[in-house]
Regions:
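Proteins that catalyze or organize thiol-disulfide redox chemistry
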Residues: 1-26, 31-56, 64-79, 84-109
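Conserved residues in the N-terminal Rossmann fold of short-chain dehydrogenase/reductase
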Residues: 59
Length: 109
């Protein structure tokens, strides 16, 4: 599920890539075994390419980064967290569409 336009997050780089970012960040909490996660991944990849330079799109594998999942109270996946200026501003759990994602990003601007 990695793509050159998306950032693979873990406990070591989360703070620098998300909480210290000067750009809005979408963080996708996902797992390899999650069907809906695989369905939403191409939408996030498109957004990462289209909004490159203005928005970061990042992914956290919940199986490999359980402490981040606990910290952000992830109880179902996919869960998309929207950060701006290091603060959590919005959250979606479950499948959504590209228009909704873009609308939520635009609201952060």
């Amino acid at each position: 599920m990695e793509n050159s336009a998306t950032i693979d997050l873990n406990e070591a780089n989360f703070e620098n890539e998300v909480t210290k970012s000067d750009k809005p960040v979408i963080v996708d909490f996902w797992a390899e075994w999650c069907g809906p996660c695989k369905m939403i991944a191409p939408l996030l990849d498109e957004i990462a390419k289209e909004k490159s330079g203005t928005v970061k799109v990042a992914k956290v594998n919940v199986d490999q980064n359980q402490s981040l999942s606990i910290k952000y109270n992830i109880r179902a996946i996919p869960s998309l967290l929207f950060f701006k200026n290091g603060r959590l501003r919005d959250q979606i759990t479950g499948m959504t569409n590209k228009k909704d994602l873009i609308g939520r990003l635009d609201a952060l601007a």
